[in-house]
């Protein structure tokens, strides 16, 4: 049986908002079966709950943001990616601000928090969204596509005219599992170019950005003294983002995702396109130990 998962304990952390530069408190709490992932703006009175749902996405420039009843929560993609990577179905995320902390620019700190809180398997079958037929969305030369696949596979191509991002390091593909996610994807940091950061600062964005939480490039090189964590860290981070953006579809996915130069906007467009076409997907569970086993491997909680 592939069971739903939540946290075993509540855990708290503090960090800086990438765009606001403000100190942010985050609390991750267990949630009951079929609750899903829900963000709560506890700095507001009354508190506003914002479900992690693709149809609530309103911000897709530089991050993924959700809005409900006028309340926003931004930069959700890295935490959502960690939830997906560890197979967390149900959780409550309390926030003291409209933005999640950027941590080190990857999802690894969130993975560590979830590991520290412990993972609890619940007495209910995990519900997968299985892609039944191909769905593709485009925006100019950018493409994002889901196809049927017995498992969860992600392939991504980036294209940047920069000597540190050569063509041979512009494509990456992974067969999704908890172990592969933690080892191959979770450490990949967000990245940006010095000229873009200067433009963002002029618009009061990226105020919390630094080489402590992002890879920064000038026209020729990586400026971070410690260099890259992976030779192709840039494209791996795009997969990290995609895993988080796509988890807003409402559950773990069985299908193949292929993207060319996609980003938060196109990822959300793909999620909405799938959900709008009920013939392209179905819910499926694996409730019995004797029944067919799910083709996606989630590491046992005791081993994470």
Curated annotation (Swiss-Prot):
EC number(s) stated in the UniProt entry for this protein: 3.5.1.108
Keyword Transcription regulation: no
GO molecular function, a single term: metal ion binding
Pathway: Glycolipid biosynthesis; lipid IV(A) biosynthesis; lipid IV(A) from (3R)-3-hydroxytetradecanoyl-[acyl-carrier-protein] and UDP-N-acetyl-alpha-D-glucosamine: step 2/6
Name the record gives this protein: UDP-3-O-acyl-N-acetylglucosamine deacetylase
Catalytic activities: a UDP-3-O-[(3R)-3-hydroxyacyl]-N-acetyl-alpha-D-glucosamine + H2O = a UDP-3-O-[(3R)-3-hydroxyacyl]-alpha-D-glucosamine + acetate
Protein task: Catalyzes the hydrolysis of UDP-3-O-myristoyl-N-acetylglucosamine to form UDP-3-O-myristoylglucosamine and acetate, the committed step in lipid A biosynthesis.
Residues annotated as the enzyme's active site: 264 (proton donor)
Gene3D superfamilies: lpxc deacetylase, domain 1, lpxc deacetylase, domain 2
HAMAP family noted in UniProt: LpxC (MF_00388)
């Amino acid at each position: 049986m592939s069971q739903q998962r939540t946290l075993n304990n509540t855990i708290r952390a503090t960090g800086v908002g990438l765009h606001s530069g403000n100190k942010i408190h985050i609390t991750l709490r267990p949630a009951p079966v079929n609750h899903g992932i829900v963000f709560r703006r506890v700095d507001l009175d009354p508190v506003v709950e914002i479900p992690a749902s693709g149809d609530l996405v309103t911000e897709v420039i530089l991050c993924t943001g959700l809005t409900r009843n006028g309340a926003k929560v931004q930069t959700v993609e890295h935490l959502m990616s960690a939830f997906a990577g560890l197979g967390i179905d149900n959780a409550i995320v309390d926030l003291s601000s409209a933005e999640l902390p950027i941590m080190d620019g990857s999802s690894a700190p969130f993975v560590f928090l979830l590991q520290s809180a412990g993972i609890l398997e619940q007495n209910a079958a995990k519900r997968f969204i299985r892609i039944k037929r191909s769905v593709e969305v485009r925006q100019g030369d950018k493409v994002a596509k889901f196809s049927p696949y017995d498992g969860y596979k992600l392939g991504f191509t980036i294209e940047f005219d920069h000597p540190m991002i050569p063509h041979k390091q512009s494509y990456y593909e992974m067969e999704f599992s908890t172990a592969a996610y933690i080892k191959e994807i979770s450490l990949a940091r967000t990245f940006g170019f010095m000229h873009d950061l200067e433009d963002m600062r002029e618009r009061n964005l990226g105020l919390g950005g630094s080489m402590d939480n992002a890879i920064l490039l000038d026209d020729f090189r990586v400026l971070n003294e410690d260099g890259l964590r992976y030779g192709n860290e840039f494209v791996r981070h795009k997969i990290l983002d995609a895993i988080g953006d796509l988890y807003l579809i409402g559950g773990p996915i069985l299908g193949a995702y292929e993207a060319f130069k996609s980003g938060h906007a196109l990822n959300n467009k793909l999620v909405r396109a799938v959900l709008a076409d009920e013939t392209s997907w179905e819910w499926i569970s694996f409730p019995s130990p004797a029944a067919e086993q799910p083709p996606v491997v989630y590491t046992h909680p005791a081993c994470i």
